[in-house]
């Protein structure tokens, strides 16, 4: 099996494991902030794999930066956060600031990735977008930790059920790790010039 195929297979296995966790409500079996602990552990695993597994790092670094940025359109999930707040299923302190921040980051990802820029301008735009997106996702995670600890996890129960359980078990670790990979790529590009 080729390295790229093995990496894709690993991601599919991880995705199906995340679906399993959500389907059987496994995050509910642990005290808060277990979901955020899962985010931390999975992000650390991705970062360590990127740092120490040359084949994985080569595969990630071969991806077009615009493709990595476009992955962040998944952050339009922020609209769903706001919708769930309006239905009373997520607290304002998490859903509205986090949702609006994610919507902005997703919209900016489209601009940065799809608009016609010169290479230097694109790299600068990606850097600015990456800083904004990274800060936003960290604020969302820290907000979730604070709310989970203060309320015993009841306010964020929606994050333990599908489809939102895919956030801590799959999507958010990929988002954080992708921001770190973009920072690494941009630093190397800057060092070359």
Whereabouts are the PLM-identified features?
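N-terminal membrane topogenic signal
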Residues: 1-11, 188
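Hydrophobic core of alpha-helical transmembrane segments in multi-pass integral membrane proteins
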Residues: 12-23, 36-52, 110, 134-141
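Juxtamembrane "helix-exit" motif on the non-cytosolic side of transmembrane helices
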Residues: 19-29, 81-90, 144-151
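A glycine-rich, hydrophobic loop/mini-helix early in the fold
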Residues: 29-88
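Hydrophobic cores of alpha-helical transmembrane segments in multi-pass inner/ER membrane proteins
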Residues: 39-51, 104-113, 167-185
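Juxtamembrane membrane-water interface segments of multi-pass membrane proteins
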Residues: 49-63, 111-127, 147-152, 179-193
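Membrane-proximal helix-loop-helix units in multi-pass membrane proteins
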Residues: 70-123
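Short, membrane-exposed interhelical loops at transmembrane-helix boundaries
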Residues: 149-167
């Amino acid at each position: 099996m080729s390295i790229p195929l093995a990496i894709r297979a690993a991601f599919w296995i991880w995705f199906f494991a995340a679906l399993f966790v959500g389907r059987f409500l496994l995050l509910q079996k642990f005290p808060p902030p277990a979901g955020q602990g899962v985010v931390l552990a999975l992000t650390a695993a991705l970062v360590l794999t990127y740092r120490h597994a040359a084949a994985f790092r080569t595969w990630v670094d071969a991806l077009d930066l615009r493709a990595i940025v476009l992955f962040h359109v998944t952050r339009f999930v922020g609209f769903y956060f706001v919708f769930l707040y309006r239905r009373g299923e997520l607290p304002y302190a998490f859903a509205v600031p986090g949702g609006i921040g994610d919507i902005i980051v997703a919209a900016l990802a489209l601009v940065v990735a799809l608009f016609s820029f010169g290479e230097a301008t694109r790299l600068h735009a990606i850097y600015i977008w990456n800083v904004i997106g990274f800060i936003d996702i960290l604020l969302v995670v820290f907000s979730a930790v604070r709310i989970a600890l203060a309320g015993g996890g009841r306010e964020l129960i929606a994050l333990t059920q599908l489809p939102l359980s895919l956030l801590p078990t799959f999507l958010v670790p990929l988002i954080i790790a992708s921001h770190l990979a973009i920072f690494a790529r941009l630093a190397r590009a800057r060092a070359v010039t």
